[in-house]
Swiss-Prot record:
Classification via InterPro entries: CmoA (IPR005271), Methyltransf_25 (IPR041698), SAM-dependent_MTases_sf (IPR029063)
Function, in words: Catalyzes the conversion of S-adenosyl-L-methionine (SAM) to carboxy-S-adenosyl-L-methionine (Cx-SAM).
Superkingdom field: Bacteria
One Gene Ontology term of the molecular function aspect: S-adenosyl-L-methionine binding
Protein name: Carboxy-S-adenosyl-L-methionine synthase
Transmembrane residue ranges: none
Lineage, broadest ranks: Bacteria, Pseudomonadati, Pseudomonadota, Gammaproteobacteria, Aeromonadales
Species the sequence originates in: Aeromonas hydrophila subsp. hydrophila (strain ATCC 7966 / DSM 30187 / BCRC 13018 / CCUG 14551 / JCM 1027 / KCTC 2358 / NCIMB 9240 / NCTC 8049)
Amino acid sequence: MHTKDQIFAAPIARLGDFCFDEQVVDVFPDMIQRSVPGYSNIISAIGMMAARYAQPQSRLYDLGCSLGAATQAMRRHVTQPGCHITAVDLSHPMIERARAHLSGFKSEVPVELVEADICDIAIENASVVVLNFTLQFVEPEKRAALIQRIFDGLRPGGILILSEKFRFEDAPVNELLIDLHLDFKRANGYSELEISQKRTALENVMRTDSLPVHQARLRDAGFAHQDLWFQCFNFGSMIAIKSSEPAQP
């Protein structure tokens, strides 16, 4: 049984920026399930896609791994020989809790847990890279360089799975999907106070992009094949495939 998220249930006089500290880590499984529509579906599909695209003797990266849900999904599904997962998170409590979670499962796929900024991680010999609701917390001016480094570090035929909360350029549609997401959170037991305080805490640390912005960034990095494969309200996930054919001059 997961600990219930009640971080914002009482009024907070001096509300700081949201951070992935011990308090958040303690309730993270409950928080993510009650806040992100389709999260379980995305995690399951990450495992399925890793099974299809993992290449023998390659690395799989989970960048912003939190408690290791995507890492564990990949471990369960990957059967190619010689694969190795590198799971990275900047939060010390997240990495320590992920280590405890992952140690409870036996797998032939080794995992290296790294406490670091994902913008400082070298991507090498990769067949699968996962950014699961992580890029939105990276400073906007650093995002293109990160995507480029991922592309450069992928083997031909490798994939990037990019899950994000999206902003929509059509104002009425954007407003509708925001409202539907708020209804989703209300239906999952969050009060108006919790919703309001969490939104305020997140506004300076989570900055969302539109789908066309993501698509242009992926295209500019060199991904010839990319599209949205999942969406629920204003949350979704994209897949980008590095062509196995040499780029045309």
